[in-house]
């Protein structure tokens, strides 16, 4: 059996409404679609995924006590510059970052994963500026 290599990839644009969706369940589906695993021509070493636009990122939910107990950490680069914020604080500061961090952790590390991540567009509100690409509504 010969290995199939996707040379030319047709990429579609999809828009996903994150309002009321659980963060982890949404992120796993987004990561899978960004990799292209839903396509028959999926090849692990080729970026075959689609472009995905996520709207209403500020309305994503988490289960249990994660709203107050889930903590995001980052470092400023200065000595003693460790910072942290709870899920609730992150949603109020930068709601796009919550979905971006969740999806980025599920993608491959390296140049191919970075290319896949660039196809994810996240917006806090209900509007996006990708109408020219004619995105299809994706119900997750």
Curated annotation (Swiss-Prot):
PROSITE patterns: RIBOSOMAL_L13 (PS00783). Keywords: Ribonucleoprotein, Ribosomal protein. One of its GO terms (molecular function) is mRNA binding. GO terms for cellular component: cytosolic large ribosomal subunit. GO terms for biological process: negative regulation of translation; translation. InterPro entries: Ribosomal_uL13, Ribosomal_uL13_bac-type, Ribosomal_uL13_CS, Ribosomal_uL13_sf. Part of the 50S ribosomal subunit. This protein is one of the early assembly proteins of the 50S ribosomal subunit, although it is not seen to bind rRNA by itself. It is important during the early stages of 50S assembly. Belongs to the universal ribosomal protein uL13 family. HAMAP family: Ribosomal_uL13. This is Large ribosomal subunit protein uL13. The gene is rplM.
């Amino acid at each position: 059996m010969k290995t199939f290599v996707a040379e030319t990839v047709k990429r579609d644009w999809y828009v996903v409404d994150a309002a009321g969706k659980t963060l982890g369940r949404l992120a796993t589906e987004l990561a899978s679609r960004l990799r292209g695993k839903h396509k028959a021509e999926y090849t692990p070493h080729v970026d075959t995924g689609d472009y995905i636009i996520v709207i209403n990122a500020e309305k994503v939910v988490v289960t249990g006590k994660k709203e107050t107990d889930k903590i995001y950490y980052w470092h400023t680069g200065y000595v003693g510059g460790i910072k942290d914020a709870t899920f609730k604080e992150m949603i109020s500061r930068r709601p796009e970052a919550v979905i971006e961090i969740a999806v980025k952790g599920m993608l491959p590390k390296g140049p191919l994963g970075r290319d896949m991540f660039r196809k994810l567009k996240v917006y806090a509100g209900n509007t996006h500026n990708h109408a020219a690409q004619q995105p299809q509504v994706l119900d997750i």
